[in-house]
Amino acid sequence: MLTTPKSYITFIGRIGKKNHQFPRHSCLLTSPFGRKAMQFFDTHAHIGLIYDDPIEQLRVIQQAKQAGVTRIVSINNSLHDFERVYPNLKALPGIYHAVGVAPSEVTNPGSNYIDKIEQYLSNPNVVAVGETGLDYFKQFGDKRSQIELFITQLELAQKHNLPVIIHNRDAGKDVFDVLSERIPDSGAILHCYSEDAAYAKKCLDMNIYFSFAGNLTYRNARNLHETIMNIPLDRILIETESPFMVPAEFRGKRTMPAYLTSTAKFLAEMLEMDLEELSQQLWKNSCKIFKLSEE
């Protein structure tokens, strides 16, 4: 049974007031004296789409760390993009990588793409396969070809004992059906979650995590708000999906990993949790799915 707590109804009413604003966050989120600063983990950022310039990419990382976002998973839609971005970021502490072919590239995944993915999965700090999945909104290729590309990468994730990062747009049923049969043992992340609470609850029997982007902060994102209220806290991740899905307080700008704390603050208020407590749980969740030390 889906639940809608009274506290959530009150919360939605509050953010609906025209003069209500969430407090602007400072550059660095610090805990009281003698305690460690809060740390945040951006589980999905397209660094190479924010800026082409390698120097600007490094500045994005620096700004994120100043804002308390000390770990980021760098995402690319194609192997070509991975080959362009990875060399620039590979030596940076706290920056991790996923390798895969998104459904947008289904008609041209690249020659020998399977061999190349396997090769790159052995690179330092590569922690996941992805992003991959299904996208029926823009009708990239045909559905059968997308599903075949998706399954191929799920099998690679299983072979290499890695989680998979999943793109799902207007393809929820097929994504669920494929995962029901082929989800890798290391689990999956439904990134930039866009389905409803009922869909999420069906997924709970599988080792699936739900990653929420800046659109969680939109007042009309009722499906996302209800999902948050109906799934365990230990399955929740947050991401920026940079440069897309900008949080409400930064509307009109390109999303940056540094903006992740805006989504975290919104989520903390929504769940009536202390931000530091929430940040610790999100950190733990992220490290668990990517098999990283929490230290």
Task: Locate each region found by the language model.
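Mid-domain alpha/beta scaffold segments of enzyme catalytic cores
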Residues: T4-R14, H20-E295
